[in-house]
């Protein structure tokens, strides 16, 4: 028989509390139970005056942002519109059915006038992470580091070319000391001091967002973007991150991220990273500090048809290289970049049968370079071949890459709607904090057991089964049905038969 809906219910007056209208298993209930946000009052009390009209509750402001990022709402304007019609969102904020929701510009004005130059968002991120750790959900034996690019809110056709000074490497001083030491051991004079004129490079600078960087996204696509180098644990909780322009290499932004992570996590064992971080300086730092760098095989950047560097065997005792034709390449010098140069005898190489596969130089001299910290890179290769390292590295796709995938697909991380490094950092701080909070809320909910109004059925299951099969005629042929389920689906939290 075809049924017809009576739409008079739309105008019926019913007595119900807002709490009754929000499903017991809704995510907002899990968020509310996961962490007490009242600590925000102590963090912002000095940012408000002691007189005048009462402001909007700062905890409510933060909860509005949490709703935006947790549910992946693209803008604050749309977030406010969703809150106006969504009973669960109103319940989470503590707003009644007829209470006016704050204007969409409220958070922006509060950020500009109060929160801009504070560490409030960083403290919220840290507090959530502390709660995760207190619940025992952090697994920091293996830390996974990687970078992703976030498209900037900038027109790729509006830019100007500028000449900038090349930034010095953060380990430049240590490297120069190692170079001088290496040259003295080989009987070479110290390098002359560099000219005072600094090195310069040409860059495309956006006129819309100068803090962003020109990023080559694939072979035919270039955009202005930001880079977020991020560290997470085995359970996908974000430990910390570092935001830079999109044209900054991962190995450059690693150092600030490593400093932050070292302050948060004291005794990690493995640092799992991709080939973008595989440089001698990073390998040296991790190994000397007792960490185990887990990095992949990196294909040698050799011209097609030429011997690879691995085809030249290094003799550590005599400090020389042997070529595929068993000729010796002797030490020549150590350059400013920290590479020892080993050169062959051009007279012997002139008639070598492998010359076309070895070198294309006019004087027939083959030069093989070796970094002064190359020994650490060899240790990284040894670690790569150890038992279990391959399995640890393969966890990247389930951890850090999953963090980026969820962030971009579910929480609006693919694009940034803000301009400037400070605002983008604020956005990512809140985004990662909300991702951690969402996972924390779900995990705590599961750890606490089933919390829904049907859960009491498990207590009375024997009575229910007796009535079903013994006292009600024909009941054994009826399938259990839960009125709270959607579209007549079976609710497994109510019945187990």
Residue ranges and their predicted role:
Residues 1-29:
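Hydrophobic alpha-helical membrane-insertion signals
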Residues 4, 72-85, 95-497:
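Anion-binding and metal-coordination hotspots
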Residues 11, 24, 37, 57, ...:
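Generic alpha-helical segment signature
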Residues 17, 43, 60-66, 106, ...:
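A general alpha-helix detector
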Residues 24-66, 71:
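Basic, short loop/linker segments at the boundary and entry of helix-turn-helix/winged-helix-like folds
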Residues 38-42, 86, 90, 410:
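A short secondary-structure junction motif
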Residues 42-48, 90-97:
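Short amphipathic helix-turn modules centered on a small-residue break
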């Amino acid at each position: 028989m075809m049924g017809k809906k009576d739409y008079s219910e739309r105008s019926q007056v019913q007595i119900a509390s807002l709490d009754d209208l929000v499903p017991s298993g809704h995510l907002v209930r899990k968020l509310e139970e996961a962490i007490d946000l009242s600590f925000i009052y102590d963090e912002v009390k000095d940012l408000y005056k002691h007189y005048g009209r009462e402001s909007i509750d700062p905890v409510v402001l933060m909860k509005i942002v949490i709703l935006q990022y947790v549910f992946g709402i693209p803008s604050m304007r749309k977030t406010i519109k969703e809150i106006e019609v969504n009973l669960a969102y109103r319940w989470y904020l503590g707003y009644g059915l007829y209470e006016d929701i704050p204007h969409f510009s409220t958070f922006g004005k509060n950020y500009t006038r109060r929160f801009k130059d504070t560490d409030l968002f960083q403290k919220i991120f840290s507090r959530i992470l502390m709660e995760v750790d207190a619940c025992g959900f952090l697994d920091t034996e293996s830390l996974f580091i990687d970078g992703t690019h976030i498209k900037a809110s900038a027109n790729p056709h509006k830019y100007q070319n500028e000449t900038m000074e090349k930034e010095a490497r953060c380990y430049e001083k240590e490297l120069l000391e190692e170079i001088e030491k290496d040259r003295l051991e080989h009987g070479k004079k110290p390098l002359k001091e560099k000219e005072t004129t600094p090195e310069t490079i040409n860059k495309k600078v956006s006129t819309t967002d100068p803090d962003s960087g020109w990023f080559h996204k694939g072979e035919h696509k270039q955009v202005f973007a930001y880079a977020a180098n991020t560290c997470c644990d085995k359970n996908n909780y974000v430990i910390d991150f570092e935001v830079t322009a999109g044209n900054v290499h991962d190995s450059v932004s690693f150092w600030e991220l490593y400093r932050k992570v070292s302050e948060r996590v004291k005794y990690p064992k493995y640092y799992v990273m991709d080939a973008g971080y595989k440089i001698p300086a990073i390998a040296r730092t991790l190994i000397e500090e007792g960490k185990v760098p887990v990095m992949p095989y990196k294909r040698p950047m050799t011209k097609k048809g030429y011997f690879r560097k691995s085809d030249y065997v290094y003799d550590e005792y005599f400090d020389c290289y042997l070529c595929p034709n068993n000729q010796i390449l002797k030490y020549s010098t150590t350059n400013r970049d920290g590479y020892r140069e080993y050169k062959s005898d051009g007279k012997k190489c002139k008639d070598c049968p492998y010359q076309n596969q070895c070198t294309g130089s006019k004087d027939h001299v083959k030069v093989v370079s070796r970094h002064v910290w190359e020994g650490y890179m060899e240790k990284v290769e040894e670690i790569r071949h150890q038992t279990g390292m391959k399995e640890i590295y393969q966890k990247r796709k389930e951890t850090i890459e999953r963090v980026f995938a969820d962030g971009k697909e579910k929480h609006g991380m693919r694009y940034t709607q803000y301009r400037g490094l400070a605002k983008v950092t604020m956005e990512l701080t809140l985004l990662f904090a909300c991702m951690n909070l969402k996972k924390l809320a779900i995990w705590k909910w599961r750890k606490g057991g089933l919390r829904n109004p049907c859960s009491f059925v498990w207590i009375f299951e024997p009575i229910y089964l007796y009535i079903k099969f013994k006292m009600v005629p024909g009941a054994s042929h009826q399938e259990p049905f839960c009125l709270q389920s959607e579209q007549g689906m079976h609710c497994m939290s109510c019945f187990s038969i």
